[in-house]
Regions:
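Non-transmembrane, aqueous-exposed alpha-helical and coiled segments at domain scale
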Residues: 1-253
Length: 253
């Protein structure tokens, strides 16, 4: 457990993780979905984002805009202070003297929880329920369904509006502000403007509803999970890969 060896393991994990995720997804798609198995090796000289998009797509094609957006996503998710659940777990495990791989495995186990790294997938699950049950051009219809979600009468019946609120940020989540800007641009390119507009309505109408339920006038904002799932969808990244890709970014922290 020398310092040099720990550093080597850590740097190698940062480098290998995106390829592990991409290849694991290819095997999963082949084994469970019966699709052709496409294994693409990373190409030297390309960024992590470029290689990841290249590796998960059978034809290896991607655009500069897609790679730039994914690169930004990876940076936004790379670290967010030592107090978040998965980083705390990693530090707690490391403090026991365990090995690097055990500490990272524990952190990944924490990250996949629906209240942490799995939240972007829960946002998209909620969004699909909303799409199926509202008139996207009628604010009243959207508001009524959000009330049903909060009452635990619709969706996953958890009584939650995923993607809203943060333990630290109140006025705004700077990650969400930046991501929303680029998500709007990608929606225009990819033809997802209606989906983006509906998600924005969920943000605008949902915040006052949650505040009302909490009997609170404390400012509240959308968090980074509100738009990250839609961005991954626009990048043709399947929901199975949302959280593993988050882990690929967060492993640096």
């Amino acid at each position: 457990l020398s310092v040099d060896n720990l550093l080597r393991q850590s740097v190698e994990l940062i480098g290998y993780f995106p390829s592990i995720v991409a290849n694991a997804y290819a095997v999963k798609r082949h084994h469970f979905g019966g699709e052709s198995l496409h294994i693409h090796y990373p190409e030297e000289g390309l960024s992590t984002a470029e290689n990841f998009l290249r590796m998960i797509r059978p034809d290896k094609s991607y655009t500069e805009e897609e790679a730039h957006l994914l690169d930004m996503m990876l940076m936004l998710h790379a670290e967010h202070g030592g107090g978040n659940n998965s980083t705390f777990v990693c530090r707690a495990l490391s403090s026991s003297g365990t090995d690097t791989y055990s500490a990272i495995a524990g952190a990944v186990g924490s990250l996949k929880g629906p209240l942490h790294g799995g939240a972007n997938a829960k946002v998209m699950e909620m969004f699909h329920y909303i799409q199926e049950n509202v008139d996207p051009h009628d604010d009243g219809s959207i508001r009524d369904y959000l009330v049903r979600l909060l009452d635990g009468e619709a969706g996953d019946r958890s009584g939650k509006l995923y993607g809203l609120g943060h333990a630290v940020y109140t006025l705004s989540d700077p990650r969400a502000v930046l991501l929303k800007k680029y998500a709007r641009h990608m929606a225009q390119i990819k033809g997802y403007e209606e989906e983006f507009d509906l998600l924005q309505k969920v943000e605008e109408l949902g915040i006052p509803l949650v505040q009302e339920r909490r009997h609170s006038d404390t400012p509240m904002c959308a968090n980074v999970d509100m738009y990250s799932g839609l961005v991954y969808t626009m990048l043709d990244i399947p929901e199975d890969v949302f959280t593993p890709l988050f882990a690929s970014a967060r492993i640096a922290g």
